[in-house]
């Protein structure tokens, strides 16, 4: 980690402080994990983003991105490809802002996820048997229908929306805070958190956590540049990303202290 980009921190700090997320997102609590704290001999706090209206932090970035669109772009409608939390977040954000949203999902997406998106007012298009095929079709719709593509993580407004998580953490825990551990997929959440934390409290470590079979950020940090993983794991599908984002890596390479990995067995043990 280097600290050579103060303009980058200033840029994101301003964007985070002016992000529009609380029209739909809530400030989630920091809950003490008593048993885990006792086992580790340390105070462990959990940021309960599972309490958001769509059960994940993704609503923050999606809403902030849509709220920053010009009236002209908003009128064009938006599209994305997702089978997970980004789809739910974008659907709800679009409904709240009165924007037409189309979500392209692979045909293999479980029906409960499809209905979750439809119930929030978005149009669902089932296409392809994999995420890359769904993504390619969503980009085709951009060309054919004139939609605005909303990236799930690699966008400064999305990163800033996710960064409001850090704003809350530092407000809720103003005293001693040694490290913040952040799950990493494409890097939107950790980039937003790292930018805000290093702007205000640079002594706090920001540590990324990835599955050992989907470690795109760890690989990029080691190489000093973005790399493409030859394959990614299937178990932790929400963070199974082959290449870290361009905008997200721009922040992470300077302001993430460390990236650690966990095995599928360790993930399963933690879920239990």
Language model features by range: what are they?
Residues 1-272:
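PLP-dependent amino-acid enzyme catalytic core
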